[in-house]
A protein has these predicted regions:
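Aromatic- and glycine-enriched beta-alpha-beta binding-site module
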Residues: 105, 117-174
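Metallocofactor- and cofactor-centric catalytic cores in central/energy metabolism, strongly enriched
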Residues: 2-136, 177-289
């Protein structure tokens, strides 16, 4: 396999889906193949409709037990759906051919809690002691929302979903702690009630919203300035609806400061073979680690 260890700043143009063959992202395997081959490194919203997508956290083994406990203690923002064997990039429970070194469109590399670079391939950084964690993602429930007749604004606008750090604190486990990060989609109050009922059936994709309405109530000062992603329009009669977000572990890693960890870049997810409604939590609050 050709090593694509290049900075994303050198990848101008391959975030554009228009130049790819029709139907390339209709299946998980097709989406991953485009990413793995270097033909695409953009956001994954709307890809392989009906299938699960995952956030990524890769850590040295010495840090893995505490992070597993952190997921158990915080299942809403950190719903664990897949985990590798030590040193293996494979996640067979989510897809037979998944390779965590190449199959995420864009990775973030963190050293001692600092973001040092973004890459579209981490093969050169892979270590024999790495453990990979895949966490459920809100992009997994967007197809379910659309099938009920609810539009997803950031998809319609061709943007990455807006994400915000909040004043809601996660439960600390070992060195991992910090604020919950949330994603936002605007709906009317009636639509929000429908969205909540739909998403409550999908706990492996963050479940029901954690907050609806006033952003200031959860510590968001300016809804027009997300911490990650892109701002999206909120129309007259709509309220912001907030879900737990799998970028939360990145905030926790900034506090824990492991010597090296690798995550996905927000909005650039691992597309899985498992249907969104077939994803299962590997551990939940109260389970034994």
């Amino acid at each position: 396999m050709t090593d694509r260890n290049r900075s994303v700043e050198m990848e101008a143009g391959i975030h554009d889906r228009a130049g790819l063959a029709p139907g390339w992202a209709a299946t998980p395997a097709g989406a991953r193949a485009a990413v793995r081959s270097g033909r695409y490194n953009g956001n994954t919203s709307g890809m392989a409709p009906g299938h699960g997508q995952g956030n990524l956290m890769i850590l040295p083994k010495d840090w893995a037990e505490d992070f597993l406990g952190y997921c158990r203690a915080n299942p809403v923002p950190c719903p664990l759906i897949g985990m590798t064997e030590t040193g293996s990039p494979a996640v067979p429970m989510l897809g037979d051919d998944i390779d965590l070194r190449t199959d995420v469109p864009r990775y973030r590399v963190w050293r001692h809690g600092e973001l040092v670079e973004e890459r579209d391939d981490i093969s050169a950084l892979w270590q024999d002691d790495f453990v990979g964690f895949v966490l459920g993602c809100s992009l997994s429930f967007e197809d379910a929302l659309e099938r009920t007749g609810l539009r997803v604004r950031h998809v319609d606008e061709g943007k990455v979903v807006p994400m915000y750090r909040t004043s809601i604190q996660t439960t600390r486990v070992g060195p991992f702690h910090g604020p919950m990060v949330v994603s936002m989609r605007p709906y009317t109050p009636a639509e929000a009630a429908i969205a909540s009922a739909v998403c409550a059936q999908l706990p492996a994709a963050h479940g029901a919203p954690v907050h609806m309405g006033d952003p200031a109530a959860i510590g968001i000062a300016d809804i027009g300035c997300p911490d990650e992603g892109e701002p999206t329009a909120i129309l007259a009669g709509e309220i912001p609806v907030f879900w737990g977000c799998g970028v939360t572990p990145q905030a926790a890693a900034m506090m824990a400061r492991p010597p090296l960890c690798i995550t996905h870049a927000p909005g650039h997810m691992l597309v899985c073979d498992v249907p969104a409604n077939g994803l299962r939590l590997l551990c939940a609050q109260g389970d034994e680690v």
